[in-house]
Amino acid sequence: MARTTPIARYRNIGISAHIDAGKTTTTERILFYTGVNHKIGEVHDGAATMDWMEQEQERGITITSAATTAFWSGMAKQYEPHRINIIDTPGHVDFTIEVERSMRVLDGAVMVYCAVGGVQPQSETVWRQANKYKVPRIAFVNKMDRMGANFLKVVGQIKTRLGANPVPLQLAIGAEEGFTGVVDLVKMKAINWNDADQGVTFEYEDIPADMQDLADEWHQNLIESAAEASEELMEKYLGGEELTEEEIKKALRQRVLNNEIILVTCGSAFKNKGVQAMLDAVIDYLPSPVDVPAINGILDDGKDTPAERHASDEEPFSALAFKIATDPFVGNLTFFRVYSGVVNSGDTILNSVKSARERFGRIVQMHANKREEIKEVRAGDIAAAIGLKDVTTGDTLCNPDHPIILERMEFPEPVISIAVEPKTKADQEKMGLALGRLAKEDPSFRVWTDEESNQTIIAGMGELHLDIIVDRMKREFNVEANVGKPQVAYREAIRSKVTDIEGKHAKQSGGRGQYGHVVIDMYPLEPGSNPKGYEFINDIKGGVIPGEYIPAVDKGIQEQLKSGPLAGYPVVDIGIRLHFGSYHDVDSSELAFKLAASIAFKEGFKKAKPVLLEPIMKVEVETPEENTGDVIGDLSRRRGMLRGQESEVTGVKIHAEVPLSEMFGYATQLRSLTKGRASYTMEFLKYDDAPNNVAQAVIEARGK
């Protein structure tokens, strides 16, 4: 089968935003205008196409990033058909992992902001993730029809809060109820969409006389930004020559692809205005798979040779699995992005991360929760495979004759855990199966059995995250569970270096004995300096410990890290240097050295000024002005550190850092303090030393 759409006409984009910026409605309109959807789905009545899990429809928030394929030939049918693969990403902080996953496989992104609320805390998180993966982006300022809408204020916030370089591509004509259309600053024309056909058709008109001066000023700003793309254009501009529309677009595109500017569009998805022009901007300014750098990887050749794969059908097949979803009808769906080559249904592929071969059964292209079966996928495609057995998020799928491991994704550690137990004996077995499936889908969700209490513990990124997991167990797997009180994921660390700590395990009891002897130094690592939070240096000279026992020493210490000496929490940011020891020709064994290492570790840890670390959350509260004092007082009582406040149209925004352990039940308290008028967001910021009294209470409660 030949390629139907040239790869240069592909756009793999994410639509990303703060909760309530109207992202799902925006995606719905995209699907409507691209001719996929014939009746517009509204989020308000739970009918939106992209929100396909029941919990999403009930809660009106997007949880799973569904991937959808659509085609667009331009608002005025001015292009050849372009294939747009859209990944819808959630806007709630507890689902940041979903955003991280989708950013990894996107080529470009549309950031949706609310014209009233502007740049919110979650917008900043998403922005950092887009920066990390160097994703070129444009912005769409939505809800221009709402009370308090102010386009240029949001443009200012993109500059000040995100440190970006926003360049408006349009201006809003009117605002709130008077919002009627936009000024196209490239063409210098007003665009008015036709309400009668839900904005499918439009007219170019003259710019309203009272906006001409403002439009001229921002047109000039746009031209200057374009001219900065090259010396040649700058000379032309400074020489007083007009830049052509084609030159302007080409120059702006180049600057967006280089992540130098963010083009800003606006509209009201709900009122069917602006989304159409934003789609044109996706085609004009966001990259195709051939415009972004080749993906890096390492060859599976035992030497970890660096390699790259270009977006071409001619190169060997390589793809990244970025999401696993359980579908009630077909079982496991593995969403993957093809970076190079071609694969057909029925082909055998290699999961190079697990060194396992899999057979591609059926391949489907998703449109929200409808699916279309296809025979092959090519470089640049995003699709889902049915029936892959052992694939986890972040695995590489590739041609078995040309194995490569693409860059792995990094997933955050959970910060909150709860105990769950099945309500009945019948639920017991089903619960294990359900939790296993859900953990496979979501790498930021963990499940384990607590060795002391024998309880099943689930851990995730926040209370809402775990609520939804428990909810899904009930709905999708019919498992009823009792849920315990949330527990904080503390950590343990050391604050000083200790040297020459000895650990000796020697047993002589008739026949062969056991003998292992190690001497180690232990030192703190700078938080975040080592992704594993642990380093092991083998500094043994002259074979005082034979090489075959060194891994056992490392393993013995790593086992101790899982449950620290203070209160049984994981130990982080610690370095070990093994530099001396001794062995016995007959009595030494791996087990003996493992035990010697664990003895040395416990001994050293006690002397190295151990501390308990607690997760600190970044909290932002928006409250009416008259409640500011109460809200700040309450945050202080929760050991919160105030980091500033600012006035907003709707009241006051308070920034604080608060320990997670003090934030349980905060939503209820905030509601009663402000009669339900305040809202807050919270996301993990860092681990910090817990004060003595808090640490003591935690240690005593753990019975250590």
Curated annotation (Swiss-Prot):
GTP binds at residues 17-24, 88-92, 142-145. GO terms for cellular component: cytoplasm. One of its GO terms (molecular function) is translation elongation factor activity. Keywords: Cytoplasm, Elongation factor, GTP-binding, Nucleotide-binding, Protein biosynthesis. PANTHER family: RIBOSOME-RELEASING FACTOR 2, MITOCHONDRIAL, TRANSLATION ELONGATION FACTOR G-RELATED. Catalyzes the GTP-dependent ribosomal translocation step during translation elongation. During this step, the ribosome changes from the pre-translocational (PRE) to the post-translocational (POST) state as the newly formed A-site-bound peptidyl-tRNA and P-site-bound deacylated tRNA move to the P and E sites, respectively. Catalyzes the coordinated movement of the two tRNA molecules, the mRNA and conformational changes in the ribosome. This is Elongation factor G. The lineage of its organism: Bacteria, Pseudomonadati, Pseudomonadota, Gammaproteobacteria, Enterobacterales. The gene is fusA.
